Amino acid sequence: MGVQYKLAVGLGKGHKVTKNEYKPRPSRRKGALSKHTRFVRDLIREVCGFAPFERRAMELLKVSKDKRALKFIKKRLGTHLRGKRKRDELSNVLVAQRKAAAHKEKTEHK
């Protein structure tokens, strides 16, 4: 709404009021990771590595077969959205691996 004027008609009629600020409901937090959860998942990933379907999907991503990787992951996980999320996660892992390899190579040459 616009600026409040002292008019009896129109959108700006009535008293000037401030909106109440409510605390967000707990359901709004769904999907947000806590520090502990993120730590535990990272630890498990470090210890267990990747599942066989994730390794195959990463191989497909390495040779730029993104659509094929998505179809493959979608078949394994069940939904399109989960497939897209997993594909993005695995492509981020590949980028991180490339960065780590480049950094390691750079430090060895010095």
Swiss-Prot record:
Transmembrane segments: none
Keyword Transmembrane: no
GO terms assigned for molecular function: structural constituent of ribosome
Pfam families per record: Ribosomal_L36e
Keyword terms, alphabetized: Cytoplasm, Ribonucleoprotein, Ribosomal protein
Broad class of where this protein is predominantly found: cytoplasm
Domain of life per record: Eukaryota
Compartment list: Cytoplasm, Cytosol; Cytoplasm
Residue ranges with Basic residues bias: 25-34
Signal peptide region: none
Presence of the UniProt keyword Membrane in the record: no
One annotated Gene Ontology cellular component of this protein: cytosolic large ribosomal subunit
Disordered: annotated segments: 13-34
GO biological process, one term: cytoplasmic translation
InterPro entries (alphabetical): Ribosomal_eL36 (IPR000509), Ribosomal_eL36_sf (IPR038097)
Function according to Swiss-Prot or TrEMBL: Component of the large ribosomal subunit.
Subunit-level organization: Component of the large ribosomal subunit.
Entry similarity comment: Belongs to the eukaryotic ribosomal protein eL36 family.
Name of protein: Large ribosomal subunit protein eL36
Species per Swiss-Prot/TrEMBL record: Ixodes scapularis (Black-legged tick)
